[in-house]
Amino acid sequence: MERAVARGEFACLVFNSVSIKLKGRGIRSVIAAGVVASALSAGAVCAPAMAQDKASADHIKAVTSAVDTGFIRANAATSKDWPTIGLDYAETRYSKLDQINTDNVKQLGLKWTYDLESVRGVEATPLVVDGIMYVTASWSVVHAIDVRTGKRLWTYDPGVPRDGGYKGCCDVVNRGVALYKGKVFVGAFDGRLVAIDAVTGKKVWEEDTIVDHSHSYTITGAPRVVNGKVLIGNGGAEFGVRGYLTAYDADTGNQLWRWFVVPGDPSKSFEDESMEKAAKTWDPAGKYWINGGGGTPWDTMAYDPDLNLIYIGTGNGAPWNRNKRSPAGGDNLYLASIVALNADTGKYVWHYQETPGDNWDYTSTQPMILADLTIDGAPRKVILHAPKNGFFFVIDRTNGKFISAKNYVDVNWAKGYDANGRPIEVPEARGEKPYDAIPGPYGAHNWHPMSFNPKTGLVYLPAQHVPLNLSEDKSWRNNSNIPGQAMSGLGWNLATAINVVDPTSQPFGRLIAWDPVKQQQVWKQDYVSPWNGGTLTTAGNLVFQGSADGRFIAYNATTGEKLWESPTGTGIVAGPATYMVDGVQYVSVAVGWGGVFGLLERATDKEGPGTVFTFAVGGNASPPEFTKYQMQGLVEGVKYNPADVGPGTLLYVSNCVFCHGVPGVNKGGAIKNLGYIPASELANLKDIAFNGPFKAHGMPDFTGKLKEEDLLKITAFIQGTADAIRPKPAAK
């Protein structure tokens, strides 16, 4: 079921000098005496006033219809608008606007906030063209907002089934939309690509992008549009899928081309020469094709119009453990790689693999940037990339040749890269003993956007570490559901055991200013937690970033000095945008804690709905009220059989842990920690787990997946863990 609420569907009447506006969400103005409700259906429109209204249907149609490849390229010269997810096709997130700068940023104030009406993660960067904003919330819901007023124009809900949230590894998030020739494009969480009329919010067309519905494919990334082609990838490697990128006709939705990242069953014909080449780097004894092999290109893309190349970053292996999917080893192309494709045909041109034979969920899907740098005295067209594996790469984007790589955080899986661009691996990283992975699968840098300022020559990189210990799961089989295997009850296929031994490394969150030519850190800012927001840098010598503990911050781009901050209540994970409207520069950021780390942890004691915060110099609007996060004391008093704690632990790991965390240990993020729920709820867990009473919030229905005796064992684990960690009364 889908829902569109459109500003364009209203009547504007003048009666006894009183204007009445009826919007899809109800009557916003007071209906004056003498105005009869039946008149609202008359269809009379205040045409002269509407012609002057920059939020009118005519104006929105005019400005959004002008957005095409030429518009996006031309806008890169001024940065007046923010027409594509990374601002420009190079994904620099560098704005040439400087009305807000180091001299006046302290005068930045709130202009307005907009309630996204979401309680899960918000990862989208807003698009803005001449004061019309398009942004997504959780569940792939699209909002159109009038920047001049902060008011809603329309919303579009693609109707993603709310009980299907478990089909994604990392929350029901969406990183934004694409805008092209009067249409807004969104990749829905359930795998549909939807084109929406930019004026009305009505669906124009939709296409199912999923090739195999027996596995859990999802979409969380933003589409890109290049020369009339809408490009979209997918996620789901944890669930055993085969990654691919597809191009659709922006006008009709017809599929134009598709490129698979990894090969299929070698007993069948390969789609093209690139797949035949890739198959030679996989061991068929692992029967990798049963669960796809992975490689899903779920986020980053960039486009070089001069070379006519699309660049994508590819994902991790399925399963994680290479010993299982490819027992004889091999690079397993094109996992964890940057791949260049012909933008017209989708044909493979070149690749550079950043993590050969990925074994640690070291995706290369993290945002990349195209830049022109002088290296060793010569101009080079390069890709700048900081993937999960902890190394910062500089790659020649004309041919995929390796230029340099340097670790931007501590790493223990490799000592560095040789002259040929191959990692010098540490043998223990693939050993049989439990291994404290640094970085871990959360990545030294995840999807949070980085930015590049050509004036300072620096990249502003959200770095982090979330400790995890990895070891081989020798009991794993394809699509097995064995208690104790991480989330196997919901379809995960890792072949890797997590935290069988407690990790000893320490977590951190950090903003790093990195010199890509010298391959060194210039300055840094440390945070209280991992999982901080993406960055934006400007010609005003500023860097903007949101933090996990609920602050939106501006730094001096050259020195790293903190110049300004504003509280946002809940944590920020998304990247901000800046743009000019009627001669005024604005900065907007979509706030809403969540994502894979944010599901089970938090860094602030406040919470609230997803909200767009918009700032300008001199703004003085009041922020929304921040609600204190309600976390009761550790649950106590629920009776259980101590013998059930062990089996309950295994069942919890297989069905609950990646959403709810460890009872009483994690704080609970976008989803509650079960160690802190009321005893009455824990004692009646079957009323929560069966028949889907909370599916509207993303909770799956475990009917048929678990039995009542299983829930009693899970209850025993939760209560037993709470009892074990509860502080003991001080001895008298």
PLM regions with names:
Residues 661-694:
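Gly/Gly-Pro-rich "capping" loops immediately C-terminal to redox-active cysteine motifs
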Residues 648, 652-663, 699, 704, ...:
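The canonical Cys-X-X-Cys-His
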Residues 187, 703-732:
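C-terminal capping alpha-helices of c-type cytochrome domains
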Residues 82-86, 119-141, 166-192, 218-239, ...:
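Repeat-blade elements of multi-bladed beta-propeller folds
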Residues 628-651, 667, 731:
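Electrostatic cytochrome c docking/interface patches
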Residues 53-110, 268-276, 422-423, 500-501, ...:
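Blade/loop signatures of beta-propeller domains
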